[in-house]
Protein backbone atom coordinates (compact mmCIF):
# COMPACT_ATOMS: atom_id res chain seq x y z
CA UNK A 1 0.00 0.00 0.00
CA UNK A 2 1.52 3.41 -0.95
CA UNK A 3 2.42 5.84 1.83
CA UNK A 4 -0.32 8.39 2.49
CA UNK A 5 1.05 11.94 2.31
CA UNK A 6 -1.36 14.82 2.92
CA UNK A 7 0.94 17.80 3.50
CA UNK A 8 4.02 18.90 1.56
CA UNK A 9 6.07 22.01 0.76
CA UNK A 10 7.19 22.81 -2.79
CA UNK A 11 8.98 25.53 -4.74
CA UNK A 12 7.68 26.78 -8.08
CA UNK A 13 9.70 28.89 -10.52
CA UNK A 14 8.00 30.19 -13.65
CA UNK A 15 10.03 30.79 -16.81
CA UNK A 16 11.45 34.17 -17.77
CA UNK A 17 10.21 35.92 -20.87
CA UNK A 18 12.53 35.86 -23.87
CA UNK A 19 14.63 38.93 -24.61
CA UNK A 20 13.59 41.37 -27.30
CA UNK A 21 16.06 41.81 -30.16
CA UNK A 22 17.88 44.77 -31.63
CA UNK A 23 17.97 44.21 -35.42
CA UNK A 24 17.58 46.20 -38.63
CA UNK A 25 16.33 45.43 -42.09
CA UNK A 26 19.12 44.23 -44.35
CA UNK A 27 17.55 44.08 -47.78
CA UNK A 28 18.77 44.83 -51.25
CA UNK A 29 17.69 48.24 -52.53
CA UNK A 30 16.71 49.32 -48.98
CA UNK A 31 19.68 51.48 -47.96
CA UNK A 32 18.16 52.81 -44.75
CA UNK A 33 16.34 49.79 -43.35
CA UNK A 34 14.42 50.50 -40.16
CA UNK A 35 14.27 48.48 -36.93
CA UNK A 36 13.27 44.84 -37.31
CA UNK A 37 13.94 43.27 -33.92
CA UNK A 38 11.17 40.95 -32.73
CA UNK A 39 9.73 40.45 -29.25
CA UNK A 40 10.68 37.67 -26.88
CA UNK A 41 8.27 34.83 -26.17
CA UNK A 42 6.33 34.41 -22.94
CA UNK A 43 7.90 32.31 -20.20
CA UNK A 44 6.19 29.11 -19.10
CA UNK A 45 3.82 29.22 -16.12
CA UNK A 46 3.45 26.62 -13.36
CA UNK A 47 -0.09 25.22 -13.22
CA UNK A 48 -1.64 22.84 -10.68
CA UNK A 49 -4.40 20.64 -12.14
CA UNK A 50 -6.75 18.24 -10.36
CA UNK A 51 -6.32 14.59 -11.35
CA UNK A 52 -9.06 12.34 -9.98
CA UNK A 53 -6.71 9.35 -10.23
CA UNK A 54 -4.53 10.68 -7.41
CA UNK A 55 -5.35 10.04 -3.75
CA UNK A 56 -2.24 11.37 -2.01
CA UNK A 57 0.58 13.90 -2.33
CA UNK A 58 3.10 11.05 -2.31
CA UNK A 59 4.59 12.04 -5.70
CA UNK A 60 5.85 15.31 -4.20
CA UNK A 61 8.06 13.65 -1.58
CA UNK A 62 10.91 13.25 -4.03
CA UNK A 63 10.17 16.10 -6.43
CA UNK A 64 9.60 19.40 -4.68
CA UNK A 65 11.19 21.98 -6.98
CA UNK A 66 9.44 22.77 -10.26
CA UNK A 67 10.87 25.04 -12.95
CA UNK A 68 9.17 26.09 -16.17
CA UNK A 69 11.12 26.88 -19.33
CA UNK A 70 12.03 30.38 -20.49
CA UNK A 71 10.51 31.99 -23.57
CA UNK A 72 12.54 32.12 -26.75
CA UNK A 73 14.37 35.35 -27.59
CA UNK A 74 13.03 37.59 -30.33
CA UNK A 75 14.51 37.32 -33.82
CA UNK A 76 15.20 39.53 -36.80
CA UNK A 77 12.58 40.33 -39.43
CA UNK A 78 10.18 41.23 -36.61
CA UNK A 79 9.81 37.57 -35.64
CA UNK A 80 8.53 36.92 -32.13
CA UNK A 81 10.21 34.19 -30.12
CA UNK A 82 8.17 31.11 -29.26
CA UNK A 83 6.33 31.04 -25.96
CA UNK A 84 7.47 28.33 -23.57
CA UNK A 85 5.15 25.46 -22.71
CA UNK A 86 3.50 25.66 -19.32
CA UNK A 87 4.47 23.11 -16.68
CA UNK A 88 1.33 21.29 -15.48
CA UNK A 89 1.51 19.47 -12.13
CA UNK A 90 -1.16 16.92 -11.20
CA UNK A 91 -2.63 17.12 -7.68
CA UNK A 92 -5.40 15.11 -5.98
CA UNK A 93 -8.90 16.45 -5.60
CA UNK A 94 -9.25 18.37 -2.34
CA UNK A 95 -5.82 20.04 -2.37
CA UNK A 96 -5.54 23.42 -0.66
CA UNK A 97 -2.61 25.63 -1.69
CA UNK A 98 -1.02 28.18 0.68
CA UNK A 99 1.68 30.77 -0.03
CA UNK A 100 4.21 30.28 2.76
CA UNK A 101 5.65 33.78 2.35
CA UNK A 102 2.32 35.54 2.90
CA UNK A 103 0.27 32.87 4.68
CA UNK A 104 -2.51 33.46 2.14
CA UNK A 105 -4.65 30.64 0.75
CA UNK A 106 -3.80 30.62 -2.95
CA UNK A 107 -6.59 28.30 -4.03
CA UNK A 108 -8.75 25.30 -3.20
CA UNK A 109 -8.70 22.60 -5.87
CA UNK A 110 -11.91 20.62 -5.47
CA UNK A 111 -13.26 20.13 -9.01
CA UNK A 112 -12.03 17.47 -11.43
CA UNK A 113 -9.89 19.18 -14.08
CA UNK A 114 -9.73 22.46 -12.16
CA UNK A 115 -6.55 24.45 -12.82
CA UNK A 116 -4.68 27.04 -10.79
CA UNK A 117 -1.75 29.07 -12.10
CA UNK A 118 0.54 29.31 -9.06
CA UNK A 119 3.48 31.02 -10.79
CA UNK A 120 2.99 33.14 -13.89
CA UNK A 121 5.61 33.18 -16.62
CA UNK A 122 7.25 36.51 -17.46
CA UNK A 123 6.20 38.41 -20.56
CA UNK A 124 8.63 38.65 -23.43
CA UNK A 125 10.77 41.75 -23.78
CA UNK A 126 9.95 44.13 -26.62
CA UNK A 127 12.21 44.34 -29.65
CA UNK A 128 13.50 47.60 -31.10
CA UNK A 129 10.58 47.88 -33.54
CA UNK A 130 8.61 49.31 -30.57
CA UNK A 131 11.03 52.14 -29.82
CA UNK A 132 11.35 53.91 -33.17
CA UNK A 133 10.44 57.60 -33.15
CA UNK A 134 10.99 60.62 -35.40
CA UNK A 135 13.92 61.63 -33.21
CA UNK A 136 15.39 58.13 -33.14
CA UNK A 137 14.29 56.16 -36.24
CA UNK A 138 16.93 53.46 -35.69
CA UNK A 139 16.87 52.74 -31.94
CA UNK A 140 19.28 50.30 -30.39
CA UNK A 141 16.82 49.63 -27.60
CA UNK A 142 15.29 46.30 -26.64
CA UNK A 143 13.91 44.95 -23.40
CA UNK A 144 15.04 41.84 -21.61
CA UNK A 145 12.30 39.38 -20.79
CA UNK A 146 10.34 39.83 -17.58
CA UNK A 147 11.36 37.42 -14.80
CA UNK A 148 8.88 34.65 -14.01
CA UNK A 149 7.26 34.46 -10.60
CA UNK A 150 8.77 32.38 -7.80
CA UNK A 151 6.70 31.06 -4.89
CA UNK A 152 7.21 28.79 -1.91
CA UNK A 153 3.98 26.85 -1.38
CA UNK A 154 2.41 24.36 0.99
CA UNK A 155 0.02 21.78 -0.42
CA UNK A 156 -2.48 20.29 2.00
CA UNK A 157 -4.86 17.49 1.07
CA UNK A 158 -8.28 17.47 2.70
CA UNK A 159 -10.27 14.44 1.61
CA UNK A 160 -13.60 15.00 -0.08
CA UNK A 161 -16.15 12.74 1.57
CA UNK A 162 -19.87 13.12 2.23
CA UNK A 163 -19.64 11.19 5.49
CA UNK A 164 -16.87 11.03 8.06
CA UNK A 165 -16.59 8.22 10.61
CA UNK A 166 -15.31 9.58 13.92
CA UNK A 167 -14.67 8.05 17.31
CA UNK A 168 -11.94 6.80 19.60
CA UNK A 169 -9.53 4.13 18.32
CA UNK A 170 -10.89 0.60 17.94
CA UNK A 171 -14.61 1.46 18.06
CA UNK A 172 -15.22 -0.26 14.70
CA UNK A 173 -14.85 2.50 12.11
CA UNK A 174 -12.70 0.50 9.70
CA UNK A 175 -14.90 -2.56 10.07
CA UNK A 176 -18.05 -0.57 9.25
CA UNK A 177 -16.37 1.00 6.22
CA UNK A 178 -15.32 -2.41 4.90
CA UNK A 179 -18.86 -3.78 5.31
CA UNK A 180 -20.72 -0.95 3.57
CA UNK A 181 -18.22 -0.03 0.82
CA UNK A 182 -16.05 -3.03 0.10
CA UNK A 183 -12.96 -0.99 0.98
CA UNK A 184 -10.14 -2.94 2.59
CA UNK A 185 -8.67 -0.84 5.40
CA UNK A 186 -6.25 -2.43 7.85
CA UNK A 187 -8.23 -3.90 10.76
CA UNK A 188 -6.78 -5.27 14.00
CA UNK A 189 -7.54 -5.36 17.72
CA UNK A 190 -5.20 -2.57 18.82
CA UNK A 191 -5.31 1.21 18.85
CA UNK A 192 -4.26 3.25 15.82
CA UNK A 193 -4.50 0.34 13.40
CA UNK A 194 -5.77 2.96 10.96
CA UNK A 195 -2.96 5.44 10.42
CA UNK A 196 -4.35 7.11 7.29
CA UNK A 197 -7.86 8.06 6.14
CA UNK A 198 -9.57 5.43 4.01
CA UNK A 199 -12.24 6.29 1.46
CA UNK A 200 -15.02 4.16 0.01
CA UNK A 201 -18.30 4.51 -1.89
CA UNK A 202 -21.58 3.37 -0.34
CA UNK A 203 -24.01 2.11 -3.02
CA UNK A 204 -27.63 1.76 -1.85
CA UNK A 205 -30.28 -0.48 -3.47
CA UNK A 206 -32.39 2.59 -4.35
CA UNK A 207 -29.59 3.94 -6.56
CA UNK A 208 -28.25 6.55 -4.18
CA UNK A 209 -24.57 6.63 -3.33
CA UNK A 210 -22.18 8.66 -1.21
CA UNK A 211 -18.51 8.76 -0.25
CA UNK A 212 -17.56 7.67 3.25
CA UNK A 213 -14.20 8.24 4.94
CA UNK A 214 -12.86 6.25 7.87
CA UNK A 215 -10.65 8.65 9.80
CA UNK A 216 -7.83 7.61 12.15
CA UNK A 217 -9.03 7.46 15.76
CA UNK A 218 -9.10 10.58 17.89
CA UNK A 219 -7.76 10.87 21.42
CA UNK A 220 -7.75 13.66 23.99
CA UNK A 221 -5.50 16.50 22.87
CA UNK A 222 -5.87 15.74 19.17
CA UNK A 223 -6.69 19.37 18.39
CA UNK A 224 -3.26 20.25 19.80
CA UNK A 225 -1.51 17.59 17.75
CA UNK A 226 -1.56 14.71 20.25
CA UNK A 227 -1.69 11.23 18.70
CA UNK A 228 -2.63 11.54 15.04
CA UNK A 229 -4.05 14.94 15.91
CA UNK A 230 -4.14 17.52 13.18
CA UNK A 231 -3.28 14.93 10.51
CA UNK A 232 -6.78 13.59 11.07
CA UNK A 233 -8.82 16.66 11.90
CA UNK A 234 -8.17 18.51 8.64
CA UNK A 235 -9.93 15.75 6.71
CA UNK A 236 -13.19 16.25 8.62
CA UNK A 237 -13.53 19.83 7.36
CA UNK A 238 -15.12 18.88 4.04
CA UNK A 239 -17.56 16.22 5.30
CA UNK A 240 -21.29 16.92 5.32
CA UNK A 241 -22.43 14.35 7.90
CA UNK A 242 -20.56 12.76 10.81
CA UNK A 243 -21.21 9.25 12.12
CA UNK A 244 -19.93 9.24 15.69
CA UNK A 245 -19.14 5.64 16.67
CA UNK A 246 -19.14 4.55 20.32
CA UNK A 247 -18.27 1.05 21.50
CA UNK A 248 -21.06 -0.21 23.76
CA UNK A 249 -20.01 -3.84 23.61
CA UNK A 250 -16.82 -3.44 25.62
CA UNK A 251 -17.54 -0.46 27.89
CA UNK A 252 -20.35 0.78 30.11
CA UNK A 253 -22.64 3.69 29.28
CA UNK A 254 -20.93 6.27 31.52
CA UNK A 255 -17.51 5.70 29.94
CA UNK A 256 -19.04 5.73 26.46
CA UNK A 257 -20.72 9.09 27.17
CA UNK A 258 -17.48 10.52 28.55
CA UNK A 259 -15.63 9.55 25.37
CA UNK A 260 -18.48 10.92 23.24
CA UNK A 261 -18.02 14.33 24.88
CA UNK A 262 -14.23 14.11 24.62
CA UNK A 263 -14.43 13.68 20.85
CA UNK A 264 -16.79 16.63 20.46
CA UNK A 265 -14.53 18.81 22.62
CA UNK A 266 -11.63 18.05 20.28
CA UNK A 267 -13.76 18.96 17.26
CA UNK A 268 -14.78 22.24 18.90
CA UNK A 269 -11.17 23.07 19.83
CA UNK A 270 -10.05 22.55 16.25
CA UNK A 271 -12.98 24.35 14.61
CA UNK A 272 -16.29 25.15 16.37
CA UNK A 273 -18.05 25.00 12.99
CA UNK A 274 -17.55 21.22 12.97
CA UNK A 275 -20.13 20.82 15.74
CA UNK A 276 -22.74 22.31 13.41
CA UNK A 277 -22.45 19.31 11.10
CA UNK A 278 -25.28 16.77 11.45
CA UNK A 279 -24.09 13.98 13.70
CA UNK A 280 -25.54 10.50 14.17
CA UNK A 281 -24.42 8.46 17.17
CA UNK A 282 -23.70 4.85 16.20
CA UNK A 283 -23.52 2.24 18.96
CA UNK A 284 -21.21 -0.52 17.72
CA UNK A 285 -20.46 -4.15 18.61
CA UNK A 286 -24.06 -4.83 19.56
CA UNK A 287 -23.51 -8.57 19.05
CA UNK A 288 -21.60 -8.72 22.37
CA UNK A 289 -23.44 -9.99 25.52
CA UNK A 290 -23.92 -6.79 27.57
CA UNK A 291 -24.20 -4.38 24.67
CA UNK A 292 -28.00 -3.94 24.79
CA UNK A 293 -27.94 -3.15 28.50
CA UNK A 294 -25.19 -0.58 27.93
CA UNK A 295 -27.15 0.93 25.03
CA UNK A 296 -30.34 1.39 27.07
CA UNK A 297 -28.42 3.17 29.81
CA UNK A 298 -26.47 5.25 27.29
CA UNK A 299 -29.68 6.55 25.70
CA UNK A 300 -31.02 7.56 29.13
CA UNK A 301 -27.82 9.45 29.91
CA UNK A 302 -27.96 11.25 26.56
CA UNK A 303 -31.57 12.33 27.11
CA UNK A 304 -30.71 13.64 30.57
CA UNK A 305 -27.59 15.48 29.39
CA UNK A 306 -28.39 19.21 29.49
CA UNK A 307 -25.03 20.15 27.91
CA UNK A 308 -26.29 19.02 24.51
CA UNK A 309 -28.33 21.46 22.38
CA UNK A 310 -30.52 18.51 21.38
CA UNK A 311 -30.45 14.77 21.92
CA UNK A 312 -28.73 13.14 18.94
CA UNK A 313 -30.25 10.27 17.02
CA UNK A 314 -28.78 6.90 18.09
CA UNK A 315 -28.45 3.83 15.88
CA UNK A 316 -27.23 0.45 17.05
CA UNK A 317 -25.34 -1.87 14.70
CA UNK A 318 -23.21 -4.96 14.53
CA UNK A 319 -20.69 -4.97 11.71
CA UNK A 320 -20.26 -8.70 12.34
CA UNK A 321 -23.92 -9.71 11.89
CA UNK A 322 -24.74 -6.60 9.77
CA UNK A 323 -27.70 -5.89 12.06
CA UNK A 324 -28.90 -2.29 11.73
CA UNK A 325 -26.34 -1.40 9.06
CA UNK A 326 -28.76 -0.91 6.15
CA UNK A 327 -31.12 1.22 8.23
CA UNK A 328 -28.17 3.39 9.26
CA UNK A 329 -27.05 3.84 5.65
CA UNK A 330 -30.56 4.80 4.49
CA UNK A 331 -30.89 7.40 7.25
CA UNK A 332 -27.42 8.73 6.46
CA UNK A 333 -28.32 9.12 2.77
CA UNK A 334 -31.49 11.00 3.73
CA UNK A 335 -29.49 13.32 5.97
CA UNK A 336 -26.95 14.02 3.22
CA UNK A 337 -29.76 15.10 0.90
CA UNK A 338 -30.96 17.58 3.54
CA UNK A 339 -27.47 18.97 4.20
CA UNK A 340 -25.81 21.57 1.94
CA UNK A 341 -22.76 20.34 0.10
CA UNK A 342 -19.27 21.56 0.93
CA UNK A 343 -19.12 25.19 -0.18
CA UNK A 344 -16.66 25.35 -3.07
CA UNK A 345 -16.75 27.72 -5.98
CA UNK A 346 -17.50 26.04 -9.28
CA UNK A 347 -14.69 26.36 -11.79
CA UNK A 348 -14.68 26.22 -15.54
CA UNK A 349 -12.40 23.35 -16.49
CA UNK A 350 -11.26 25.28 -19.56
CA UNK A 351 -10.12 28.39 -17.69
CA UNK A 352 -7.32 28.36 -15.15
CA UNK A 353 -7.46 30.74 -12.20
CA UNK A 354 -4.25 32.71 -11.76
CA UNK A 355 -2.85 33.44 -8.32
CA UNK A 356 -1.60 36.98 -7.82
CA UNK A 357 0.47 37.48 -4.69
CA UNK A 358 -0.75 40.44 -2.62
CA UNK A 359 1.37 43.54 -3.18
CA UNK A 360 2.17 45.51 -0.07
CA UNK A 361 2.13 49.27 -0.49
CA UNK A 362 5.74 50.27 -0.97
CA UNK A 363 7.58 53.14 -2.66
CA UNK A 364 8.80 52.77 -6.23
CA UNK A 365 12.35 52.87 -4.91
CA UNK A 366 14.38 53.20 -1.71
CA UNK A 367 17.85 54.63 -1.13
CA UNK A 368 20.40 53.25 1.31
CA UNK A 369 24.17 53.30 1.63
CA UNK A 370 26.76 50.54 1.99
CA UNK A 371 29.59 50.70 4.50
CA UNK A 372 32.00 51.53 1.67
CA UNK A 373 29.97 54.62 0.76
CA UNK A 374 28.24 53.18 -2.31
CA UNK A 375 24.65 54.35 -2.75
CA UNK A 376 22.19 51.47 -3.13
CA UNK A 377 18.92 51.70 -5.05
CA UNK A 378 16.23 49.05 -4.48
CA UNK A 379 12.48 48.56 -4.78
CA UNK A 380 10.24 46.23 -6.77
CA UNK A 381 9.34 48.68 -9.57
CA UNK A 382 12.90 49.95 -10.00
CA UNK A 383 14.39 46.45 -9.96
CA UNK A 384 11.86 45.23 -12.52
CA UNK A 385 12.84 48.05 -14.89
CA UNK A 386 16.50 47.23 -14.31
CA UNK A 387 16.30 43.51 -15.09
CA UNK A 388 14.34 44.26 -18.26
CA UNK A 389 17.00 46.71 -19.50
CA UNK A 390 19.48 45.37 -22.03
CA UNK A 391 22.70 46.99 -20.82
CA UNK A 392 24.64 45.82 -23.88
CA UNK A 393 23.26 48.75 -25.89
CA UNK A 394 23.95 52.39 -25.07
CA UNK A 395 20.47 53.47 -26.18
CA UNK A 396 18.96 51.05 -23.65
CA UNK A 397 21.18 52.45 -20.91
CA UNK A 398 20.11 56.00 -21.76
CA UNK A 399 16.45 54.94 -21.74
CA UNK A 400 16.90 53.40 -18.28
CA UNK A 401 18.53 56.62 -17.07
CA UNK A 402 15.50 58.57 -18.31
CA UNK A 403 13.16 56.17 -16.53
CA UNK A 404 15.03 56.70 -13.27
CA UNK A 405 14.90 60.45 -13.72
CA UNK A 406 11.13 60.38 -14.36
CA UNK A 407 10.66 58.27 -11.20
CA UNK A 408 12.41 60.98 -9.20
CA UNK A 409 15.50 58.93 -8.40
CA UNK A 410 17.99 61.64 -9.40
CA UNK A 411 16.31 64.29 -7.26
CA UNK A 412 16.03 61.91 -4.31
CA UNK A 413 19.74 61.05 -4.52
CA UNK A 414 20.66 64.74 -4.53
CA UNK A 415 18.45 65.36 -1.50
CA UNK A 416 20.20 62.46 0.24
CA UNK A 417 23.56 64.13 -0.34
CA UNK A 418 25.09 62.32 -3.30
CA UNK A 419 28.12 63.94 -4.88
CA UNK A 420 29.31 63.98 -8.47
CA UNK A 421 31.38 60.83 -9.07
CA UNK A 422 29.84 58.78 -6.22
CA UNK A 423 29.12 55.13 -7.00
CA UNK A 424 25.53 53.86 -7.25
CA UNK A 425 24.56 50.17 -7.19
CA UNK A 426 21.41 48.44 -8.43
CA UNK A 427 21.61 44.74 -7.62
CA UNK A 428 25.06 43.77 -9.00
CA UNK A 429 25.38 46.69 -11.44
CA UNK A 430 27.51 49.66 -10.32
CA UNK A 431 27.72 53.00 -12.12
CA UNK A 432 29.04 56.48 -11.45
CA UNK A 433 26.65 59.33 -10.67
CA UNK A 434 27.11 62.35 -12.93
CA UNK A 435 25.35 65.64 -12.19
UniProtKB/Swiss-Prot annotation:
Domain OBG-type G: 161-337
Gene3D superfamilies from the UniProt entry: GTP-binding protein OBG, C-terminal domain, GTP1/OBG domain, P-loop containing nucleotide triphosphate hydrolases
Subcellular location: Cytoplasm
One annotated GO molecular function: magnesium ion binding
UniProt binding sites for GTP: 167-174, 192-196, 214-217, 284-287, 318-320
Binding residues annotated for Mg(2+), in chain numbering: 174, 194
SUPFAM superfamilies registered for this protein in UniProt: Obg GTP-binding protein C-terminal domain, Obg GTP-binding protein N-terminal domain, P-loop containing nucleoside triphosphate hydrolases
Example of a GO cellular component annotation carried by this entry: cytoplasm
Known cofactor(s): Mg(2+)
Keywords: Cytoplasm, GTP-binding, Hydrolase, Magnesium, Metal-binding, Nucleotide-binding
Domain OCT residues, every copy: 357-435
GO process terms (BP): ribosome biogenesis
Superkingdom of origin: Bacteria
Main enzyme class: hydrolase
One Pfam family per UniProt: DUF1967
Chief place where the protein resides: cytoplasm
Function: An essential GTPase which binds GTP, GDP and possibly (p)ppGpp with moderate affinity, with high nucleotide exchange rates and a fairly low GTP hydrolysis rate. Plays a role in control of the cell cycle, stress response, ribosome biogenesis and in those bacteria that undergo differentiation, in morphogenesis control.
PANTHER family reported for this sequence: DEVELOPMENTALLY REGULATED GTP-BINDING PROTEIN-RELATED, MITOCHONDRIAL RIBOSOME-ASSOCIATED GTPASE 2
Subunit structure, as described in the record: Monomer.
Protein known as: GTPase Obg
Organism, scientific name: Limosilactobacillus fermentum (strain NBRC 3956 / LMG 18251) (Lactobacillus fermentum)
